[in-house]
Amino acid sequence: LPAAYGLARHPGWLSRLLEEFISLPLAVPGLALALALLQLYGSMKGFRASWAFILVGHVLYTLPFMVRSILAVLAAMDLKTLEEGAASLGASPWQRFRDIVVPNAMPGILAGALTVVTLSIGEFNLTWMLHTPYLKTLPVGLADSYASMRLEIASAYTLVFFVMIVPLLMAMQWASARAQRITQ
């Protein structure tokens, strides 16, 4: 939210450049991103063996989707006028952000969050490169089960995948329809 807010609040060549920089992971395959992370942080054994390492990879991979989702909602409203109105009533910058920006950006936050979670659950290449034997995510466990011909375990992984993804996709559709109704 802060990145999208900053980009929406201060348009110009610098914000366009920052937006392109934030969108860079869209042009880089997950495998290349994982290799870069391994090159940078692979020697840090404590960090490399923790779940935070995979989390950093997923945040970098999905950040553009979240920022663009929120930015689209913020760009559709007259943010400057809303903030000036709140400031004229004595609201501090923090109050304006909390009480004006966040509620108005909520459809974008919700749509972005659902998109990010759905992408993150299904991302295999990045996670496969970053995981350790003690840290397996759902896609890696599913692939390992099929590779070792443990079809009963693979079936259980598939069922868990299905139970997680279908409600998320339904929530994304609902959030998208709700956001369209709100903006019209």
What are these regions (language model features)?
Residues 71-83, 87, 93-101, 155-184:
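C-terminal transmembrane helix and the adjacent membrane-cytosol boundary/short C-terminal tail
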Residues 42-65, 108, 113:
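Loop-to-helix entry region at the N-terminal start of transmembrane alpha-helices
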Residues 60, 67-71, 79, 93-122:
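Transmembrane alpha-helices
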Residues 21-25, 56, 102, 110, ...:
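Hydrophobic residues within alpha-helical transmembrane segments
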